[in-house]
Amino acid sequence: MTNIRKTHPLMKIINHSFIDLPAPSNISSWWNFGSLLGTCLIIQILTGLFLAMHYTSDTMTAFSSVTHICRDVNYGWLIRYLHANGASMFFICLFLHVGRGLYYGSYMYLETWNIGVLLLFAVMATAFMGYVLPWGQMSFWGATVITNLLSAIPYIGSDLVQWIWGGFSVDKATLTRFFAFHFILPFIVAALAGVHLLFLHETGSNNPSGLSSDADKIPFHPYYTIKDILGVLLLMLALTSLVLFSPDLLGDPDNYTPANPLNTPPHIKPEWYFLFAYAILRSIPNKLGGVLALVMSILVLAIIPLLHTSKQRSMMFRPFSQCMFWILVADLITLTWIGGQPVEHPFIIIGQLASILYFLLILILMPITSLLENNLLKW
């Protein structure tokens, strides 16, 4: 009798995706982040579901409902902080996953890469709307500032902003619709992640060398299931440590003050994972220019396959490109730092230089470095 996992229509799909999947024998721990992102998404959906059971999306009661969750609901504080810090872990895994793709040339799988860029946008939108829900000072002013950016769109800008707000300012209608979107988007993200995997399994995984691994495959289970479980355990350790020891480490103290439209906080800034894009937005004095730069800072990922000039796929054997890659990483860390600083000297000029360097590296310096390496190797 044949095994049910190989014959049953549904089990067969799971089998081909997670059990009998032929995987390269040399993929490193940098390939763990896909499964970690899946784990993060499941944690976020489950904790979010339990939070939604007690949360009320009304401007009068939103803040106090979050307080009620933390004080009165059984383990409500744990669920709330798992959800808030789970978002941070989600973005750490996302950035490392994208970085891995850039370093090892995984962007050559065009469909998988483009779905990934779409996923990044969807997760960023979800996180932004989630940040508005507790209705603290930073929630309200963050929502006001970021939605207001759409008014920079010529002709339809101001109408578009009022349409999104559902009125003439961020108010009850805005909060209610943000809650609705924040609830539905993770399920869209889950569906997109399924498509992401579908396209990945059409080609098979890339590996650190960037060479074809068809001649040397191993089954996903037990080798990579065990490896993924180790990754998940380390993720859980990091998340629980953060939640139980310093749950507010990555948050903003201003968000413990209820939203007040009459009182603007001294420094309006988003969560830490958006600071690099926020720094790029602020470094351009023109409103429309800033918005375009903000969008392009993420959208530039979509054109990276077109900028691949090297004859090798991976950066494993390309020391000059590696150097450029790590300069880019340092630049992104600098932008993240600048995004959290006030708009004054010397932070303004540092932010502008870091923003220029970001686009310069991706669009010009890295492709030129690849061409140089081709010539050095006489290819």
UniProtKB/Swiss-Prot annotation:
Binding site for heme b b566: H97, H196
InterPro entries: Cyt_b/b6_C, Cyt_b/b6_C_sf, Cyt_b/b6_N, Cytb/b6-like_sf, Cytochrome_b, Cytochrome_b_C_euk/bac, Cytochrome_b_N_euk/bac, Di-haem_cyt_TM
PANTHER family cross-referenced by the UniProt entry: CYTOCHROME B
Pfam families: Cytochrom_B_C (PF00032), Cytochrome_B (PF00033)
Record text on subunit structure and interactions: The cytochrome bc1 complex contains 11 subunits: 3 respiratory subunits (MT-CYB, CYC1 and UQCRFS1), 2 core proteins (UQCRC1 and UQCRC2) and 6 low-molecular weight proteins (UQCRH/QCR6, UQCRB/QCR7, UQCRQ/QCR8, UQCR10/QCR9, UQCR11/QCR10 and a cleavage product of UQCRFS1). This cytochrome bc1 complex then forms a dimer.
Misc. comment: Heme 1 (or BL or b562) is low-potential and absorbs at about 562 nm, and heme 2 (or BH or b566) is high-potential and absorbs at about 566 nm.
CC cofactor: heme b
Residues annotated to bind heme b b562: H83, H182
Job description of the protein: Component of the ubiquinol-cytochrome c reductase complex (complex III or cytochrome b-c1 complex) that is part of the mitochondrial respiratory chain. The b-c1 complex mediates electron transfer from ubiquinol to cytochrome c. Contributes to the generation of a proton gradient across the mitochondrial membrane that is then used for ATP synthesis.
Keyword field: Electron transport, Heme, Iron, Membrane, Metal-binding, Mitochondrion, Mitochondrion inner membrane, Respiratory chain, Transmembrane, Transmembrane helix, Transport, Ubiquinone
Predominant place of localization: mitochondrion
GO molecular function: metal ion binding; ubiquinol-cytochrome-c reductase activity
UniProt-annotated binding residues for a ubiquinone: H201
Its membrane topology: Multi-pass membrane protein
Membrane-spanning parts: 33-53, 77-98, 113-133, 178-198, 226-246, 288-308, 320-340, 347-367
SUPFAM superfamilies named among the record's database cross-references: a domain/subunit of cytochrome bc1 complex (Ubiquinol-cytochrome c reductase), Transmembrane di-heme cytochromes
Descriptive protein name: Cytochrome b
Protein species of origin: Chodsigoa parca (Lowe's shrew)
Originating gene: MT-CYB
GO cellular component: mitochondrial inner membrane; respiratory chain complex III
BP term (GO), one: mitochondrial electron transport, ubiquinol to cytochrome c
Signal peptide: none
Entry's cofactor comment: Binds 2 heme b groups non-covalently.
Family per record: Belongs to the cytochrome b family.
Subcellular location: Mitochondrion inner membrane
